[in-house]
Amino acid sequence: MTSLRAIMLSATESNWRLFMLRKSDSAFLAFQQAVWRRDDYTCQFCAFRAVDYLEVVNVDGNYLNNRLDNLVTACGFCTQCFFLESIGKGTFGGGSLIYCPELTQGELNALCHVLFVAMINGFACTLQARNLYRSFKLRHQIVEKEWGEGLSNPALLGCLLVDLPHHNVDTFKGEALTKLRLLPDMVRFKTEIEHWSRAALTELIFS
């Protein structure tokens, strides 16, 4: 597999609308199958592999540019990072912003995939997984203290990024977003996690 792509937490005024519109486009839905097959059903940001509950995101951030070479496979944890302003809308995404400069966003998402499977399937390391995840969740308090009340809510931060003048957004990205990570919420991803966990358990049993 080629090197993983980096994730920059982001929010825009129109990308979410375009991302959702194409989900009802039968031609695009067929086209995304080609993207998943090319990428071997593997998230290009965290290396998580699954047959179901995958998404397709646009590399250049332009959701009008739907050329095959501009589309890559992403899991739900990584996908939501590109649409901060829309997290929590309906059934889309869920999580909190935490202070975690020692891990990249992709590394944190990959770790959460492992932790959630351990917690759901009741592996021997379940308690350790639960404690580690809890310790990450507590880091949202640092964000609230250092950057402002409510800013551990990704949708709120996303709306702030959309509304900020362009030059201020670049400054904020340099000062804050390089140290912030989006921690996926286990409850909001319950359906996907349970499905992935069953698949992982089946693979262990029959491998």
Which sequence ranges carry the predicted segments?
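Extended charged
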Residues: 1-16, 81-207
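Histidine-centered nuclease catalytic patch
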Residues: 17, 23-36, 42-74, 82-97
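Short, contiguous alpha-helical
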Residues: 78
